[in-house]
Amino acid sequence: MRALLWLVGLALLLTGCASEKGIIDKEGYQLDTRHRAQAAYPRIKVLVIHYTAENFDVSLATLTGRNVSSHYLIPTTPPLYGGKPRIWQLVPEQDQAWHAGVSFWRGATRLNDTSIGIELENRGWRMSGGVKSFAPFESAQIQALIPLAKDIIARYDIKPQNVVAHADIAPQR
């Protein structure tokens, strides 16, 4: 009985140490996250929303190729799984995607370094009879974009003036 109590006590002690707030137990080491440097700032400051100008399959192939990328791709009509629209994450948020190119916004350049990019499948604009017209965005696509954008904006504390379209940061492209 005494040995059992000793084992239970040891297990409780180890459990208490392992669950200490700010300490993360990793394979081969422990990570202490309780001390944050003040000389740091969040990398992400801008959310850039683009349209693809291509269909979904071409957009997916292009955005997973070697020359251009985006963090997210939302199809015109996202398929529903469990009642929720599916969105494709192509680049982890902590990694830089190549979606902004040569860009400028509110005094900052190289926006790929400080932004998250979302691509919306959409044919974009067409010229007809000398008139430029834009394809509308589907309601289902916008309904998928809203919770994703809200989540990103909240997590990175992105200011409203820093939620932009591609045309805002690179008007000539």
Protein language model annotation of sequence segments:
Residues 15-16:
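C-terminal motif of bacterial Sec signal peptides marking the signal peptidase cleavage site
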